[in-house]
């Protein structure tokens, strides 16, 4: 049961390494920008997949285990509503207050500007993360570990070349610079 999740976490680690490599080609200020946003990005991932994901899967599984399909459907609907609310909250915090937050972490100059550019794209589009991780958790709660694992792994594998293309302007893609990995994460 754990194999798809182990592979998913491993592939997600490769995504972070690839993003660092692509952004490192842009320069040290851009790499510092990525480092400034990393705690916020990790919080998004841990909240949408870990904290909420575990609760959603557990809630759906318990309802189905007690043969209460209506309760399972209610749990899934509530999970999607919470994900929508968290999307708005994360966007307000990290887009609306990104500059002072990243400045408080020591960001200044080009690194701060890059962090703001990255976080604006990432957190305006973070609904994609919340939706994907919430739907994956609902499926896990039904006992289907395979489908969400394959979907999340596929998305991560697609994210790597897309990140390079959008960060460095490969193959006619727009060169978004430090915002490229954020755009790739939202799209994939």
Residue spans for each PLM region:
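Residue-level signal for short hydrophobic patches within transmembrane helices
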Residues: 1-14, 18-19, 40, 44, ...
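Helix-loop interface residues and adjacent transmembrane-helix termini in multi-pass membrane transporters
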Residues: 14-17, 25-28, 63-66, 141-142, ...
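Hydrophobic alpha-helical membrane segments of integral membrane proteins
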Residues: 149-151, 183
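Alpha-helical transmembrane segments of multipass membrane proteins
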Residues: 17-21, 43, 92, 100, ...
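Interfacial/gating helices of multi-pass transporter permease domains
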Residues: 23-42, 110-117, 178-183
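Short hydrophobic/small-residue motifs within alpha-helical transmembrane segments
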Residues: 10, 126-130, 154
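Small-residue-rich hydrophobic transmembrane alpha-helices
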Residues: 31-92, 129-143, 147-148
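Short alpha-helical transmembrane segments in multi-pass integral membrane proteins
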Residues: 1-5, 60-127, 158-161, 165-188
């Amino acid at each position: 049961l754990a194999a798809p999740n182990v592979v998913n976490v491993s592939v997600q680690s490769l995504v972070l390494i690839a993003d660092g490599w692509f952004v490192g080609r842009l320069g040290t200020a851009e790499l510092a920008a990525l480092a400034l946003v990393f705690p916020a990005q990790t919080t998004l991932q841990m909240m949408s997949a870990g904290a909420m994901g575990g609760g959603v899967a557990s809630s759906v599984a318990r309802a189905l285990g007690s043969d209460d399909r209506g309760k399972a459907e209610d749990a899934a609907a509530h999970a999607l509503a919470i994900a929508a609310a968290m999307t708005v909250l994360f966007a307000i915090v990290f887009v609306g207050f990104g500059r002072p937050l990243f400045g408080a972490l020591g960001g200044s100059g080009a690194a701060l500007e890059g962090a703001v550019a990255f976080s604006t794209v990432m957190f305006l589009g973070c609904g994609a993360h919340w939706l994907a991780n919430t739907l994956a958790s609902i499926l896990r709660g039904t006992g289907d570990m395979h489908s969400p694992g394959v979907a999340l792994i596929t998305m991560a594998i697609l994210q790597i070349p897309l990140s390079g293309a959008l960060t460095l302007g490969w193959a006619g893609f727009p060169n978004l610079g430090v915002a490229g990995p954020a755009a790739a994460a939202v799209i994939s």
